[in-house]
Amino acid sequence: MRLILLSGLLLLGIFLANGDEVDPDRKLLNSLIDALMHLQREFANLKGSFLIVHKARSFGSGSERMYVTNKEIKNFEALRQICEQADGHIPSPQLENQNKAFANVLERHGKEAYLVVGDSANFTNWAAGEPNKAAGACVKADTHGSWHSASCDDNLLVVCEFYFIL
């Protein structure tokens, strides 16, 4: 009997000496800490990768804003909802290089798209004879980036604007 008891104590001592604790709460806590550290490393890697891609796209267009299409054709209200659901915005180029980046998307797809023009815009790119309120209350850009008055019911290429200031 003493031999069995001594063997049990010896085995328990070996487990404790190896750090294999019997406490399941402690094991769970250590496991959660390891998982959290792994997630933190993965997040840092993803953030770094995202920033590299964003900087590369910004470098190529000369704009800190990205203009992205899902290739759908929709009216202004549908565009507003789609961009909002995607955490984006209806395009609103504020600088010439932003308008060029926006126009590049339109040229690539051979389509026109809506944009919004602020009341205090420092940059505009109205086509000759525009804005023309008789043509409509909305604004569209052609494949060259020129702006035209348009009906908000026109079905145009869906393009949303995304900008990331980190």
Curated annotation (Swiss-Prot):
GO cellular component: extracellular region
Principal place of residence: secreted
InterPro entries found in the cross-reference section: C-type_lectin-like, C-type_lectin-like/link_sf, C-type_lectin_CS, CTDL_fold
Pfam families named in the record: Lectin_C
GO MF terms held by the record: carbohydrate binding; phospholipase A2 inhibitor activity
Record-stated family: Belongs to the alpha-type phospholipase A2 inhibitor family.
Quaternary structure and partners: Homotrimer; non-covalently linked.
Stated name of the protein: Phospholipase A2 inhibitor clone 11
Species of the source: Bothrops neuwiedi
Lineage, top ranks: Eukaryota, Metazoa, Chordata, Craniata, Vertebrata
